[in-house]
């Protein structure tokens, strides 16, 4: 019996992985333009990091983490999200002491959550995320959102929308929390066990419940916007003003809360409105986390960031029938005819690769017709034919596969000649 891939994971094979590489390359390029630097953190962290950093009332911590004990009986967890590990590294490596503040970081990496697999939702998935730590300026909130929108636009997506909300500062959240408890408590017995446990710990999370989202109390729950104090309201207005100036359209949704405990002030999601995208329309989301650095043991430092699913981005590209400009060709295929030419063909291929070209050759002693078919499948720009006659003359026959033109090139200058033709 063959061993199958674990449920909720996928193999990304040649022919498809080039799409991922292109997307990741574009992510790195936009981060370069916005001056975000790459950070790489471990795939597993101490479980305590996520208990404190993500919140013990969240679905992630309660139901979705892959946790285990190592041989030293330490509880470790495969990272379910990227913000807490980045903030942990920021604190541990004292990045808050750097002269250039805020600290602007990005990551591209695998995350792990034990969820029910479905379209756009895997148990192992890849996120591209950014974090800007050290500034309370609303301009950086707008910058983070604008970066995400510009990235999607650069991919060619047109059917996207930004949904925006504010959770306010700590005082605003407390006032809203008290109002939510008063609203839900008399009838909390009608809600699921998760909502009942969240009533005292974090009633805001009740609004994010999938089981009871159609309960009548959900529609009449007090909105956070009713409890924003003056400072929070001014901050929210400024973020909206800046987004408008940056030509980033958005919709306000007072019910948007996001699924993590660390958010304050700005929260947002970017969604696909493409037909046929599927039930899960969220492409990315993020927000401001002004207490998280302290929670993880650092100084009082504000931060904001987002994370986007590469898998869902690919779904959105397919839903909008977008073909990205991905190169699937090689520069040259070396055809060897006869035993004498085989060893020389290996040397020719080596010299071409040394000159910086993408090159392939036959390794199965196939006939010339079959070798040319291989060159076609690999979309070779040139085919170099080397037989015993060519060896005796000290030449190689070079065929341009686009025009069909052929020419004889001296063997000793062949690599540099082909390289110049491809410049």
Swiss-Prot record:
It is found in: Cytoplasm. Its EC number is 6.1.1.21. Keywords: Aminoacyl-tRNA synthetase, ATP-binding, Cytoplasm, Ligase, Nucleotide-binding, Protein biosynthesis. One of its GO terms (biological process) is histidyl-tRNA aminoacylation. GO terms for cellular component: cytoplasm. It catalyses: tRNA(His) + L-histidine + ATP = L-histidyl-tRNA(His) + AMP + diphosphate + H(+). PROSITE patterns: AA_TRNA_LIGASE_II. GO terms for molecular function: ATP binding; catalytic activity, acting on a protein; histidine-tRNA ligase activity; transferase activity. Belongs to the class-II aminoacyl-tRNA synthetase family. Homodimer. NCBIfam families: hisS. PANTHER family: HISTIDINE--TRNA LIGASE, MITOCHONDRIAL-RELATED, HISTIDYL-TRNA SYNTHETASE. This is Histidine--tRNA ligase 2.
